[in-house]
Amino acid sequence: AYPDSPILVSAVTVGGYNMAKQIIQEADAIIYFPLDMPFVSESFVKRIQPRIFMPVETELWPNFLRAIRERNIPVMMVNGRISEKSVKTYRYLYGIWDDMLNTVSRFCMQSSIDADYISHLGADPKKIYVTGNTKFDQTYAEVTPEDLENYKKELGIENAYPVIVAGATPVSYT
């Protein structure tokens, strides 16, 4: 068990990979997730031999999950989320979704809406928990002037405008 178990983190996008390298320093390795093709998934799972698979958000890949299930490796979705649009699309893929959802032993969803959506797709309600968005639990490094300029560009904020950030702090934190 952790901390004696190695941690392998995978990402699908370049942005996800770079973010993982920046904020998950406990990982023993960070890789790009393998293509979800039967041979590739089988080979990867056989080589890595994971003790547990924890997909983040809704990264469920049918061939990979099949390879995991065949080896009785537990699966727990963390920070699960699913959009209304995705629910409408996914319900037409019932056979595939039913198979994938039955492989997952715990669904830790961001919100009650996400929990309802995953239940609507066929996940067992007894396996669904609302745990909140774990991205809010992260601590980030100081923002560099370059990062600040990039954020301003992304948000369309010009330098002349003041920026007000409002938040709430629970009484238990003070």
For the regions a protein language model found, what residue spans apply to each?
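Conserved small/polar residues in nucleotide/adenosyl-binding loops
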Residues: 173-174
